[in-house]
């Protein structure tokens, strides 16, 4: 975190300090060395995710930490381009059969995940300490996710429905299994079990933001990883690899705004899902990443920096949003504020201007109606 950046935004100093205090107070300090290693590793591979997990009821924190590391191993296997696709398919399909084997570790590893893979049996030891029901949740998740991941090792993303499916394959099974866990612990409405579509939209919204933000890294891979659908980029470019070239900036921005506008359609079902979460900690666990995704869309909109590096929100901005998520009315206000802010910077010359504005106005109207409904419930209780 840069001091100059903090001083340039003094309104973010207090939220940053509050976040630091919260992180310190909620830091897990397990006595068990393997469990302590799991938490330390989670901090290394996904620092931002740690504080979200720490919002959960204490009974869920260790299982979700272990779950994340198990899935990170699976994700590392999926993305390891050093392994030919035809060899990765059976490995992904069989992954779930090995997560209880203390002698096994995923046959992959690169970058920041090398230590996780090398020490993977430590994750297995903690997995085996979980109750049988939590072990089964994680096993089911890996079985379904591994199967879904193989789909796009064999096919390309050509259409918007393909993008929906790709975003779902990387997050959907996780969202569905976590929903079952929330309901099983009586932290969410059982009706969510009949609405896998809502879990799917939660997953797709998160998945698409990652696909959008990682475009430069993906097209520079050898061979390139093409997750933006040709149905979108083909309207502006002949070759998606041109999207990072300065001479194609106008076309690249139109393409970017198009795919961002597509992602906005997931917001309504995401809000419907979060309305059905009862527990405050689980609510925050679900709501914070979705809110950050909308904020990231706003930051990325018409932003050429998407094609020159990774676009990130300031830590102070992140802290303010994180602290704003206290309940559903507060979430409505935050979603509406970001949508209004993004609408104000929409570019009239953009080919998708009208649709982008409409979807953002729909979000604001939805949040306004949700707030009115919430206020009505409060009034009824007080009557």
Curated annotation (Swiss-Prot):
The keyword Hydrolase does not apply. It catalyses: C30 botryococcene + diphosphate + NADP(+) = presqualene diphosphate + NADPH + H(+). Signal peptide: none annotated. The keyword Magnesium applies. It is an enzyme of class 1 (oxidoreductase). One of its GO terms (biological process) is lipid biosynthetic process. NADP(+) binds at residues 47, 72, 213, 312, 314. InterPro entries: Isoprenoid_synthase_dom_sf, Squ/phyt_synthse, Squal_synth-like, Trans_IPPS_euk-type. Keywords: Magnesium, Metal-binding, NADP, Oxidoreductase. One of its GO terms (molecular function) is squalene synthase [NAD(P)H] activity. Mg(2+) binds at residues 75, 79. Produces botryococcene when coexpressed with SSL-1. No activity with farnesyl diphosphate (FPP) as substrate. Belongs to the phytoene/squalene synthase family. This is Botryococcene synthase. The gene is SSL-3.
């Amino acid at each position: 975190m840069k001091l100059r950046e903090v001083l340039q935004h003094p309104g973010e100093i207090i939220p940053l300090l509050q976040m630091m205090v919260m992180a310190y107070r909620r830091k897990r300090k397990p006595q068990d060395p393997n469990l302590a290693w799991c938490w330390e590793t989670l901090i290394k591979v996904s620092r931002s995710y740690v504080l979200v997990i720490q919002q959960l009821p204490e009974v869920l924190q260790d299982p979700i930490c272990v779950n994340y590391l198990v899935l990170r191993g699976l994700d590392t296997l999926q993305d390891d381009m050093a392994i030919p696709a035809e060899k990765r398919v059976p490995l992904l399909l069989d992954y779930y059969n090995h997560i209880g084997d203390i002698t096994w570790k995923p046959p992959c590893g690169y970058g920041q995940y090398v230590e996780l893979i090398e020490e993977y049996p430590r994750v297995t030891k903690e997995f085996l300490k979980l109750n049988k029901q939590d072990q089964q949740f994680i096993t089911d998740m890996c079985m379904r996710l591994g199967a879904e991941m193989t789909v796009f090792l064999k096919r390309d993303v050509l259409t918007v429905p393909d993008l929906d499916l790709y975003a779902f394959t990387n997050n959907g099974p996780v969202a569905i299994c976590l929903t079952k866990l929330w309901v099983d612990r009586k932290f969410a409405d059982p009706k969510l079990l009949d609405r896998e579509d809502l879990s799917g939209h939660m997953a797709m919204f998160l998945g698409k933001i990652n696909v959008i933000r990682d475009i430069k890294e993906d097209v520079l891979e050898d061979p390139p990883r093409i997750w933006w659908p040709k149905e979108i980029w083909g309207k502006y470019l002949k070759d998606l690899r041109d999207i990072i070239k300065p001479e194609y900036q106008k076309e690249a921005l139109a393409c970017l705004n198009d795919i961002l506008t597509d992602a906005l359609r997931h917001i309504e079902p995401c809000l419907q899902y979060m309305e059905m979460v009862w527990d405050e900690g689980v609510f925050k666990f679900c709501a914070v990443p979705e809110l950050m995704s909308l904020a990231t869309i706003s930051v990325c909109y018409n932003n050429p920096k998407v094609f020159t590096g990774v676009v990130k929100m300031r830590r102070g901005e992140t802290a303010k949003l994180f602290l704003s998520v206290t309940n559903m009315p507060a979430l409505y206000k935050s979603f509406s504020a970001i949508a209004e802010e993004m609408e104000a910077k929409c570019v009239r010359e953009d080919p998708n201007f009208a649709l982008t504005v409409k979807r953002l106005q729909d979000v604001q109207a939805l949040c306004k109606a949700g707030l009115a409904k919430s206020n009505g419930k409060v009034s009824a209780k007080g009557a």
